[in-house]
Amino acid sequence: GIFDKLKNFAKGVAQSLLNKASCKLSGQC
């Protein structure tokens, strides 16, 4: 359903934001 799509989209966005943040913190960008 649409809610599943939204949930998956939000999960993907959160994941990429986390990846960017941890990459900046560890200085491995």
Swiss-Prot record:
Compartment annotation: Secreted
Tissues/organs with expression: Expressed by the skin glands.
Pfam family, any one: Antimicrobial_2
Disulfide bonds: 23-29
GO biological process, one term: killing of cells of another organism
Gene Ontology cellular-component annotations: extracellular region
Main location: secreted
Protein family according to the UniProt entry: Belongs to the frog skin active peptide (FSAP) family. Brevinin subfamily.
Primary role: Shows antibacterial activity against representative Gram-negative and Gram-positive bacterial species, and hemolytic activity.
Name of the protein this chain belongs to: Brevinin-2Ee
Species this protein is from: Pelophylax lessonae (Pool frog)
